[in-house]
Curated annotation (Swiss-Prot):
The lineage of its organism: Eukaryota, Fungi, Dikarya, Ascomycota, Saccharomycotina. PANTHER family: DEHYDROGENASES, SHORT CHAIN, SCP2 DOMAIN-CONTAINING PROTEIN. Signal peptide: none annotated. This is Peroxisomal hydratase-dehydrogenase-epimerase. It comes from Candida tropicalis. It comes from the Eukaryota. SMART domains: PKS_KR.
Amino acid sequence: MSPVDFKDKVVIITGAGGGLGKYYSLEFAKLGAKVVVNDLGGALNGQGGNSKAADVVVDEIVKNGGVAVADYNNVLDGDKIVETAVKNFGTVHVIINNAGILRDASMKKMTEKDYKLVIDVHLNGAFAVTKAAWPYFQKQKYGRIVNTSSPAGLYGNFGQANYASAKSALLGFAETLAKEGAKYNIKANAIAPLARSRMTESILPPPMLEKLGPEKVAPLVLYLSSAENELTGQFFEVAAGFYAQIRWERSGGVLFKPDQSFTAEVVAKRFSEILDYDDSRKPEYLKNQYPFMLNDYATLTNEARKLPANDASGAPTVSLKDKVVLITGAGAGLGKEYAKWFAKYGAKVVVNDFKDATKTVDEIKAAGGEAWPDQHDVAKDSEAIIKNVIDKYGTIDILVNNAGILRDRSFAKMSKQEWDSVQQVHLIGTFNLSRLAWPYFVEKQFGRIINITSTSGIYGNFGQANYSSSKAGILGLSKTMAIEGAKNNIKVNIVAPHAETAMTLTIFREQDKNLYHADQVAPLLVYLGTDDVPVTGETFEIGGGWIGNTRWQRAKGAVSHDEHTTVEFIKEHLNEITDFTTDTENPKSTTESSMAILSAVGGDDDDDDEDEEEDEGDEEEDEEDEEEDDPVWRFDDRDVILYNIALGATTKQLKYVYENDSDFQVIPTFGHLITFNSGKSQNSFAKLLRNFNPMLLLHGEHYLKVHSWPPPTEGEIKTTFEPIATTPKGTNVVIVHGSKSVDNKSGELIYSNEATYFIRNCQADNKVYADRPAFATNQFLAPKRAPDYQVDVPVSEDLAALYRLSGDRNPLHIDPNFAKGAKFPKPILHGMCTYGLSAKALIDKFGMFNEIKARFTGIVFPGETLRVLAWKESDDTIVFQTHVVDRGTIAINNAAIKLVGDKAKI
């Protein structure tokens, strides 16, 4: 296999004075490239300028025998950066859009200035540089572009509405460039790296930063920039030696008859089906897809029109009575239909349009509804728009950001004015109106935002670089607002409509006209504006009677544990990096994604035996060490009642809260508490680890078995702890730690526990100490069908304060400052509390169990709502998941209970 090289290739790297950009520059130069090292040299927040950063990198390249030139221009002056390349080297072949700054702030505090500054550097700078290089790419029939996105761009991130917007916009930009560049051999891709840089050093703990060197990211960038790369329009997640493609997955969705029976009520009735990715019983046209373009709406609407009228029997009531809704761009087209529908469901509608909106208002009033006109331009009059709403109705409940313009043009011919004007309406306008409505939502603890994107934003589209990037930016913005709004009951969702309007008329074929009416989109929007909408941060595609959900799907990927990963590793493992046939994941948050990546990176089954240098005699020496006495835990009915109440028991369930009840009992997960009431628990396995730091421990799974039924409600329990297995995972260790708890007087075995911990930055021997029960090792994958049972479990804002009294006093769960130090916006709920809440919900439905196993896959904040989904897999086994309704994440997965009785009560 011939090595990848960049001989005679000219590479521009923006933001190359440090971090990722610096490392890229050095590596490109080593492989023969002529490098333009661009860096303004400013501070991380974008202030100032200093040429030294770029000069230092160039000096190092030249010292090592490479060729490079420094460039000190702002990325907004992209033509000057390209001019530097052309003057020195004659052309440009590769652009790495890497420059970036941070201006983090919550939605409540973020200013338009902070928002636009980040958009300018990340997105508009990428546009300026790429636009200036495009003619050279076209002329030489060769170009490579790598846009630097981020996990925040994929999933949103608290306090980063600006950054997430820009980073997701770069995805849509890359997709459109890929489509337009195809005939010129111009390949455009995007990466979402988690790497050590000036930016991440300020937000990640040092132990994690050690794993996130730029040397782990560069090999992928080098490959995507090479002549050998044939991939284009693709996205990749990369961190710590993990490389995987991530792509869009679209659910088969639901077809509705597109007639008068298509209402918000029938959408509400079948809403869970829209989100269901089990397509095993669906026809071919409703199978899940992994698309690069909009759906086959011609087939979908044709099939939808064959259906009988929609059945609304049993559908929930949908009402927006007295809700105040602002709909932008509602003077005509989609917005007008939305306004009429919201009014029909009882809302007070403020009809915004930069033209006269009175016609829509008059139609609403004529139909018996209430409406008020607003004639302002969302691009520049956002404050006046919100003021008009408040002056008229005193508040705002729902915001539909619908206003839009098109300025379609091929990228080669697109002007900066055409780029800016589309961005100002779609992206800046959406941010500003959301920002200004936010305080009213927070004050009343209710808000609904529906942001209108486009399939051009999700998949890119020829001739729409401006539109697709802005609409893609709305995705990251919306997901961030959904995360931030969760604690205040502010829900934000995204809709990509396919409908015929005056603005979109030119893109429809003649035979498609009059098939995709705007009123076929409105039923979904009405439901998304209601009190009862169960999701936030979700993306929907809709048109012609079809509604589907769109999410990320990530390949299993490839992992390199080499200290110096080369571009050849990417080349040799490209099939694995882009393989979606097995072990795919659907991450929905930066936490979920990074935890899965961390776990994957740990999975090095090929560690050399020679790394294990412990003397065999150490084991014997350990046995001679003085041992702590096995702890004895004394508990009574007070401890039992306190624990039961923390898991939701009430006075309507006396068996849990009244010690004199004839059926007084404890929820079985009580049996894990001994591990938090004994110092020996951790001490007993710490001696097996080298360089162990308890701050780097993650509780990954927990298995518990009740051996004596029913479990006692008072007594003395003596517990012995023992390791079950230690498994090195690269520079990390997975340890399975066991305990057995017996009655201190009779010696009868009461409980056994197995806790699986993932511990970073330590070493251990690869050793199995004891066998494990089959139930503990079963993966318990959730079936690809609708659950047999589901129930929502509200989590009190104060639950962590109560639950910690049972033993787990970790300040992470109560102290805001400690939580911030751990990079959480506020204290998180105990994982074992989520475990117990789920267990009680299952007991209430199915009856008691004596075995439970679960994997922790996400965090829960007090005040959120859990949704426990359960599947009956056999007479005595119930598989379950626990979701966080507010953020659309999964907190517990790969979980099951084994019932005490013979059969499940279902």
